[in-house]
């Protein structure tokens, strides 16, 4: 609402928030034709005060739903090309967003509960919880018609193993700074959809309660 007066007929909007709900909220507020779907991914950022240290820098995954006009997507990628900002164009952006939700639900929440960084997530018990939470997301995604696979899950595990051991997911940083977390976007979403599809989500239930 604070930016509504800045949005005109030619404005294109992307959301770099995690989860799978922000595009729907923006589309309802401003019109789906203005929204290019986006996933910010593959970065490890540590924020201290007003400074951020980012390594790796990551990129944006961009797309529009099947059947939507790609004109704004093409204009956006032309801009990113001009400023040399990395991006990728997944074949199915909705599936890609669910894939990112899967890794966030696992790694971010587990890091917050275990009070650890990426190195700690490689320890057996933390990794068991992280991967278990991700598998529950996969089951819910499949029920929603999103074909996530074990290969997708293991691909994300490999990506996280490449992050610095002393790096920290954003929810771990939120916990240390006593900021409101993204738990409703992650296990909150999976628990709600799991209940609709009668899919048990015991690990996400536990993470939700702990957080």
Labelled PLM ranges:
Residues 1-51:
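Rossmann-like NAD(P)(H) cofactor-binding subdomain of soluble oxidoreductases
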Residues 5-6, 28-34, 49-151:
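Internal alpha-helical scaffold of NAD(P)-dependent oxidoreductase catalytic cores
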Residues 17, 56, 61, 175-176, ...:
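Short glycine/serine/threonine-biased micro-segments
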Residues 18-20, 39-44, 66-68, 93-97, ...:
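Glycine-rich beta-alpha junction loops
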Residues 46, 113-114, 164, 168:
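Short amphipathic alpha-helical interaction/hinge segments
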Residues 71, 81, 131-211:
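NAD(P)-dependent Rossmann-like dehydrogenase/reductase catalytic/cofactor-binding core
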């Amino acid at each position: 609402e604070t930016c509504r007066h800045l949005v005109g007929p030619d404005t294109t909007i992307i959301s770099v928030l995690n989860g799978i709900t922000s595009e729907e909220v923006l589309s309802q507020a401003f019109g789906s034709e203005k929204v290019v779907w986006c996933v910010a991914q593959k970065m490890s950022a540590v924020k201290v005060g007003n400074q951020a240290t980012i390594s790796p820098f990551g990129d944006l995954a961009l797309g529009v739903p099947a059947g939507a006009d790609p004109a704004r997507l093409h204009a956006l990628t032309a801009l990113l090309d001009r400023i040399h900002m990395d991006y990728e164009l997944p074949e199915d952006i909705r599936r890609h967003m669910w894939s990112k939700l899967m890794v966030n639900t696992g790694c971010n929440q587990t890091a917050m509960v275990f009070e650890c960084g990426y190195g700690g997530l490689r320890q057996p018990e933390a990794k068991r919880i992280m991967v278990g939470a991700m598998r529950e997301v996969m089951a819910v995604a499949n029920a929603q018609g999103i074909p996530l696979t074990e290969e997708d899950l293991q691909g994300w595990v490999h990506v996280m193993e490449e992050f610095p051991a002393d790096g920290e997911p954003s929810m771990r940083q939120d916990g240390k700074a006593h900021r409101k977390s993204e738990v409703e976007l992650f296990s909150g979403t999976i628990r709600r959809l799991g209940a609709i599809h009668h899919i048990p989500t015991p690990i996400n239930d536990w993470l939700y309660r702990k957080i």
